[in-house]
Amino acid sequence: MKVYTHFIKIDENDGYRWRTLLQFGNSWDCIGSVVMKNPGSSKMVDSEPISNDVIIKNLKKYQDIELPWYEFSEDTTMKCIAELFAYKCGLTSPDALSGVIQIFNIFYIKEADLERAKSKDAKYGLPNIFRIRTSYERLRH
């Protein structure tokens, strides 16, 4: 399993992670999605954004805005998601999966503990890229 995500660093320990994709095999077809509470303990594999043109081309299918993608490590929850999908697909192992599972989170703060995630969310808020003005707000300005 490969883990790809957008990431914005807040400080040495904290950051925002969203649009997390779990890729299995060589396929980039979406095989499912899950909604989770907050990004967990997965860690950045490389501090440099992904630069492989083939990977970037495929990742762009899954993005709303043009931002860098990073590779992260898999965490325990991601492994459980893979096992659940393999089971529901009638496969004997997550290694037999082929495609992409999208993870959507309620919080974007990378923090495995929900209470700490809530606290950090209150402290940091959201970066401007997550702020979408409504039609009403646009008309007022």
Where in this protein do the model-derived segments appear?
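Short connector loops at secondary-structure junctions
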Residues: 89, 95-117
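Flexible, charged surface loops at secondary-structure boundaries
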Residues: 24-29, 95-96, 137-141
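Acidic, metal/cofactor-coordinating or nucleic-acid-engaging core segments within structured domains
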Residues: 59-97
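Glycine-rich anion-binding loop/nest that anchors nucleotide
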Residues: 34, 38, 105, 141
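Active-site and ligand/interface coordination hotspots across diverse enzymes
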Residues: 1-69
